[in-house]
Amino acid sequence: MSGEVPVNRKLHDADVVYLYDGSFEGFLCCVFESFAQHEIPFAVWTPQRETATLYPVKDIPTDAAKARRVFASFRRKLGAETEYLVSRDFLSGREDKELLLIRFLHLAFALGPGTVKREGHPDVAPLYAMKKSLDWEVDKFQGFVRFEEHGGMLGAVIHPKNYILPLLRPHFCGRFPDENFLIYDAVHQAVLL
């Protein structure tokens, strides 16, 4: 354990599942709850992922004020790089992304802005794996989305593992500035217009 800095000793693994609406703001409220209760939940689920469990389920309502407060603390206390990594990794399709992000944030708030550089740490490495997966998939879809014309509009259907439409937007808006186009993400049931 040499070289490891202990994280908040009050922090404990809790036998509870957080249930939230699946939005980024809702996730930030899960982060708020985790810090307020000094706990790492057993799991974090959305209604789409909810399943039978022996653990109690704690409903985490989305509160815009709490979400803003948590998000503002990322840049102020952890730096722009951490803010970017957490925001981007939230788009990951990984089932346990919320729990991984919460674990990382507890570590980062305990150790400070340099935590994001500790890529070999077991609570940091998964974030870089998610980022790598997102980057690879964005690059793949930027090069391989095939559009078909339908009534003067270009349309395409994609099936990504990650929720990458927000990351594809700048590329395709720049590529087709004067075109009407639509990309439908069939996996996440979302549309980029």
Question: What function would you assign to each model-found segment?
Answer:
Residues 15-17, 101, 178:
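Generic intrinsically disordered, low-complexity segments enriched for polar/acidic and small residues
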Residues 114-193:
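Internal, well-folded beta-alpha domain core
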Residues 18-20, 55, 84, 128, ...:
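Sequence-level detector for tyrosine residue identity
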Residues 5-7, 16-17, 31, 44, ...:
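Extended aliphatic helical segments
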Residues 45-140:
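Charged, alpha-helical interface segments at or near domain boundaries
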Residues 2-63:
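N-terminal ordered "arm"
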Residues 26-37, 103-110, 170-174:
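Short, hydrophobic/amphipathic alpha-helical patches that form generic packing surfaces
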